[in-house]
Each structure stands twice: as structure tokens, then as C-alpha cells.
Amino acid sequence: MIPAPLPPVPNTIRDEYGALVLDLDRLIVTLSQRLRSFINCAPGCSSCCRKFTVLPLEATLIAGSPRPSVRSIGGEEQCPLLDDNRCTIYQQRPLICRTQGLPIGYVDETNEQIEVSACPLNFSEDHPFEYDDLLLLDPFNFRLAALNRAYCQKAGIAADLRLPLE
């Protein structure tokens, strides 16, 4: 059951989430500088901006953020928080949105290797990534999941719930 509206995020969880965002943003800046000759992302590029769901913690933080009204909504699959192909919640965007455009490294435990997911506008399919080029999200996702569990426990909702961005 989803309480409507979702209860506010306690300050301790909000502060820890802010620290998580800062840590991720620092790494993103480092990787973006390292890969700047490949990154084509710029304001107005919304190729990666799709309609998806987020954890209750991030949904609550986004819902409490000031944002301009959305004047135009893209297609059925495009993120509803875009206005003229620009993010209306850019400063408060979820973690997954912050990582778009960079090469994401995932540990494939079955095959004991690292799989890479990268924007085709930035990197060719056979781009020779080095380990230091990759954004490894597992440590950040573990922290996000722990914060979400703490919030959901206090809010009395299921931690595995996913909510659409609106």
C-alpha cells in the first residue's frame, strides 16, 4: 500500500542521500573529464531520458523539489519531466539519470567478467574501455538501497516498490 502523499524523508536519511549524490557526482566529474573527447552529451540532449520508475526514497525527494511546470511532454516513452528536451528537475534528478552518457560497468557474476553499457552516441560498440573508464555503480546502488530500506521502514511501505516519475 502506498500512502498518498508519501511521508517526508527524515533529515538523517536526506543528509545521507545528499552525501551519496555528492560522492557519485564527484566520480562522474572525474570520468567526464577523463572521457571528454568522447562525451557528446549537452543541454538539450534527451536521448537517454526515458520514462522509468524510481525507488520511494527518490520519488519522495523529487516530489518535494521545486520545479517549473512541464509545458510539453515528449512521446510515450520519453521522460515526462522534460520540457523542451531539458530536465526540469536537473539538480534533484535520480541517481540513474546522473549516470547517463558514461560507460557503466556491471559485474556479471555468472561469466565472471565486467559487462559495459554505454551510450552509442558517445562510444562505438567496440570502444576499448579501460577499467578506470568505467562507472561501477554497485557501491552507489547498495548505499541507495540501504537508504531506501530505512526510509520505507519509517514510512511503512514496501522497499521493493517502484514508482513512476511524474
Q: Where in the sequence are the language-model features?
A:
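Short loop/turn segments that flank or connect secondary-structure elements
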Residues: M1-P43, S47, T53-E166
